[in-house]
């Protein structure tokens, strides 16, 4: 776990430590990194690390969770007063994850991209995440299942897109996602 910081200075220091972990993950697999190595590399005492995180996993979870929170501030690009739509929202989503290439590289290198998916679902189901307001008229379990389906699908697209080297532009990825969300998944009577 990690500390929920109460001051801006404390939050900045915590993010600095998270960036240190990400920097270490850019050249080493996550499992190879120890708290001692990380502290030595950042020239800080172990006590400083443990002031913010209970473990290395806590630092990783904080890094991912704070990245998810950064999405809220990520700017949307709309042309000529274009109104908000599924297409523009999803294009923003894919552009955001394209900008997070160093994190996606580090997670993939260490074989722990699944943690991003799990934390993304948890974030979406929390009161903090925008998707938590999705389908408010439905019972909690139905919302949970719908949100899990949507987040898993979108994050799987992001991870595959990243793994393949971003061969399609974000706008085209958004278009594909909109089609998946708005068109029948199965066609023809052979499926019925």
How does the language model describe each region?
Residues 83-130:
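Helical hydrophobic small-molecule/effector-binding pocket
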Residues 26-27, 33, 63-89, 104-105:
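Amphipathic alpha-helical linker/stalk segments
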Residues 160-192:
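C-terminal peripheral helix-coil segments that are non-catalytic and often amphipathic
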Residues 20, 52, 62:
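Residues in the recognition helix of alpha-helical DNA-binding motifs
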């Amino acid at each position: 776990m990690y500390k929920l910081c109460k001051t801006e200075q404390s939050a900045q220091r915590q993010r600095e430590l998270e960036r240190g972990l990400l920097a270490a993950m850019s050249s080493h697999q996550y499992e190879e990194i120890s708290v001692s190595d990380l502290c030595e590399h950042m020239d800080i005492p172990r006590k400083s690390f443990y002031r913010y995180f209970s473990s290395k996993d806590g630092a990783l979870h904080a890094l991912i969770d704070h990245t998810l929170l950064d999405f809220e501030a990520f700017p949307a690009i709309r042309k000529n007063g274009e109104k908000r739509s599924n297409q523009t929202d999803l294009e923003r989503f894919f552009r955001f994850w394209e900008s997070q290439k160093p994190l996606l590289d580090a997670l993939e290198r260490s074989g722990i991209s699944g943690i991003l998916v799990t934390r993304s679902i948890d974030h979406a189901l929390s009161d903090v995440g925008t998707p938590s307001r999705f389908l408010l008229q439905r019972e909690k379990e139905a919302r949970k299942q719908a949100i899990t389906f949507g987040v898993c699908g979108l994050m799987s697209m992001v991870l595959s897109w990243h793994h393949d080297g971003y061969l399609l532009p974000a706008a085209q990825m958004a278009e594909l996602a909109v089609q998946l969300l708005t068109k029948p998944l199965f066609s023809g009577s052979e499926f019925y």
